[in-house]
Design a protein with these regions (language model features):
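Terminal targeting/leader modules
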Residues: 1-116, 133-169
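Amphipathic alpha-helical interface segments used for dimerization/assembly
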Residues: 120-132
Length: 169
């Protein structure tokens, strides 16, 4: 479980008046209510958007290991645009780069990569140590092509079917 901190900032843009951005994740349970104001300044407000449950699955260990081995391991926060007064909601958080990429591909979700907090990293490392089995990579080889497979057959050759033709004279 992590708490997600988002920021609402006014921007000078011809088509948008503001921007939402995930700025921090707080490891562990959060005691404050969703959308509690954490801080504000001129043109910006930070909220605790809510809590997000992190789940790990043994079948996805390869992507978790990839995330942990990257130069900057990340946790991905997914925000979704809505039609309500706030205009955005917390959809969740993930440590799976593939899942984050899938959300980014939809076009409706805002995905932010944030630094992976230490306790979450340790939890992931322990999970990967238990469940990760490195798969051997092998290159698939094609069957050798039979150059005679499409050849024209003559009588007496293997594969030639002798048909009885009768002349109609």
């Amino acid at each position: 479980m992590v708490g997600v901190v988002v920021e609402h900032r006014r921007i000078d843009h011809p088509w948008q008046s503001h921007r939402w951005q995930a700025v921090d994740v707080l490891p562990g349970e959060v005691s404050a209510a969703d959308w509690t104001v954490l801080g504000q300044g001129e043109g910006w407000v930070r909220y605790l958007a809510g809590a997000a449950e992190l789940s790990l699955f043994p079948g996805e260990c390869e992507t978790y290991a990839y995330n942990l081995q990257s130069r900057e391991p990340a946790i991905y926060v997914v925000l979704r645009k809505t039609d309500d007064a706030r205009g955005i909601k917390l959809l969740g958080a993930t440590v799976d780069p593939g899942e984050a990429h899938a959300h980014a591909d939809t076009g409706d979700d805002l995905v932010e990569a944030l630094p992976l907090p230490g306790p979450v990293r340790e939890w992931m490392e322990a999970f990967v140590a238990v469940h990760y089995v490195e798969r051997t990579k092998w290159k698939r080889k094609r069957d050798r092509a039979d150059p005679e497979a499409m050849a024209i057959r003559t009588p007496g050759q293997r594969g030639y079917e002798d048909a009885d033709y009768e002349d109609e004279d």
